[in-house]
């Protein structure tokens, strides 16, 4: 189940998933509920959405979406690429800012936006990370960041994690 305003890269990933797809109206939890109600309760489901939609500047109703995921036994996958390094007490993103880190199953982030480097990551339980590494060609046929980029990313994360002033300036742009 995908928010209609998800980033093109997310939509492309969903297309490659070779599974039934349902698109819900942007940030419309009532529409999402209707779709979830129509599905077999025993069927695996994942709700895919962004925390912050950069094109129109709005935030997802993360807590409400997580509540629906709990109610309908669905997984949650959140794209925090426009939020990490910018929001939260340590730059962990909108979920950190709202105290919802423990409510989301899979996080997607980037080192290319606020951190100014290159590369991306997922954060999830060991079980999910191992499954993604095993079945996702994008992870199987890629290489790790070179040490110089990993060091630059580490430095950027440390700076933004500890300097709320810089994060605030980014938010005000």
Please report, for each region that a protein language model flagged, where it lies by residue.
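Conserved PLP-anchoring active-site segment centered on the Schiff-base-forming lysine
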Residues: 1-6
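Active-site-proximal loop->helix
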Residues: 8-17
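Glycine-rich tight-turn/loop motif centered on a GG-T
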Residues: 17-19, 98
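Conserved beta-strand scaffold positions in the cores of enzyme catalytic domains, especially
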Residues: 20-23, 107
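Active-site phosphate-binding strand-loop segment of PLP-dependent enzymes
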Residues: 22-78
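Active-site C-terminal subdomain of aminotransferase-like
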Residues: 72-75, 82, 87-173
